């Protein structure tokens, strides 16, 4: 394998970095102060300030492009930062602490508490404080990198023009060389069920409930469903998830991991009805909700009554009223914007990234696309391997994976070998009294190359990044097994699983 310095020199000789740095020296990055009736001139205009949009805007400015970012909401950061990834992680973390203190976990560690009370208002306040700090951080980064922020609903009104409609009805026109659509996604509605964000809620409403419901039904046991269901189950709700598929964890999860994950969640008190569909929901006079369900392929009907119904059946691209139809840009059958490998639409100077294009709807996938898309505008290469994009479920224990699952390898006819290591045999997990789960490695039988990594256990969301690095650079299971890992750490389980995959046996199990 080439050293990084040799790779860097090789790329430099090919002119990739020089084209980006020298080709843009004459481009100004100074923001313009304008009046509403005076157009802004820009090199790149990004519509949307979520993880893909704001990162793309900053990178574009760093490359020397005069950059504008248009955002319809009052705060920057998109769904992820305001009503998604970030606030949900705050609640997941704090609800886990409460669960440990309220249950027998603390007592088993010699920590005795006479009374544990939940102050939900304070918990929500901590969540909001974290969100506010991070949204303010993006605003600071925009100023630091000289990105012009326009608050308004962005619509493409020409091949080289974006018009932002502001809350007061005024408009701001931006004349621009390139347009990048990064408008993200929105909650997919459930046919026949109206979300009021009070008792029938989407993920947005579930992040701001005023009290812990006695009973909650979650439609969908994918990533968002199990995460938010876990929050309220830990805080005291009786939670049942109804899932059309026969497993929990959503698309891409390894089935062995999914089964073990479901078992652990059930042990915690989370209930599941798999291979089951919701046929309707009715609000009663007492405020409770009757949820009608039956088998996915038909069968006996049943009614579950709850205080809060959480709808988590996925998300859909947000592409409405962007002006795409007028430009002749047609959406695919799933409502996504078709793009080429450089993220260009059928109009070469109009690009799209993130949830509005094909691929997993993940914040970090959008970030990567945003960076390489604007590098491509500057003449650079646009490399991305979607097989190396990790997925994480932030419950406790966490679930994380990257690469292929066993089911995918079987379907593709690829011969593989498996290495496993349980956290019960890991010394750090033992000292933490947190031993549920395992690491599972899939390697190519003929070459030993890592094909997939699947982790169920403490710290899985951090550990999976080591696996992503291995996949990105084509590492073998032996490569990882021969890297010295600090002791005692949870990541030793990752090394041991690779030992098992490469040599047929781990050391400590």
From Swiss-Prot:
Subcellular location: Mitochondrion matrix; Nucleus; Cell projection, Cilium, Flagellum; Cytoplasmic vesicle, Secretory vesicle, Acrosome
Superkingdom assignment: Eukaryota
InterPro entries recorded: Class-I_Pyr_Nuc-Dis_Oxidored, FAD/NAD-bd_sf, FAD/NAD-binding_dom, FAD/NAD-linked_Rdtase_dimer_sf, Lipoamide_DH, Pyr_nuc-diS_OxRdtase, Pyr_nucl-diS_OxRdtase_dimer, Pyr_OxRdtase_I_AS
UniProt entry tagged with the keyword Phosphoprotein: yes
Modified positions (N6-acetyllysine) in chain numbering: 66, 104, 122, 132, 143, 346, 410, 417, 420, 505
Cofactor(s) the protein requires to work: FAD
UniProt-annotated binding residues for NAD(+): 220-227, 243, 278, 314
SS bond list: 80-85
Site (Important for interaction with PDHX and activity of pyruvate dehydrogenase complex): 448, 473
Binding site for FAD: 71-80, 89, 154, 183-185, 355, 361-364
Cofactor binding note of this UniProt entry: Binds 1 FAD per subunit.
Catalytic center residues: 487 (proton acceptor)
GO biological process: 2-oxoglutarate metabolic process; pyruvate metabolic process
One annotated Gene Ontology cellular component of this protein: acrosomal vesicle
Entry function: Lipoamide dehydrogenase is a component of the glycine cleavage system as well as an E3 component of three alpha-ketoacid dehydrogenase complexes (pyruvate-, alpha-ketoglutarate-, and branched-chain amino acid-dehydrogenase complex). The 2-oxoglutarate dehydrogenase complex is mainly active in the mitochondrion. A fraction of the 2-oxoglutarate dehydrogenase complex also localizes in the nucleus and is required for lysine succinylation of histones: associates with KAT2A on chromatin and provides succinyl-CoA to histone succinyltransferase KAT2A.
PANTHER family (alphabetical): DIHYDROLIPOYL DEHYDROGENASE, MITOCHONDRIAL (PTHR22912:SF151), DISULFIDE OXIDOREDUCTASE (PTHR22912)
Name of this protein: Dihydrolipoyl dehydrogenase, mitochondrial
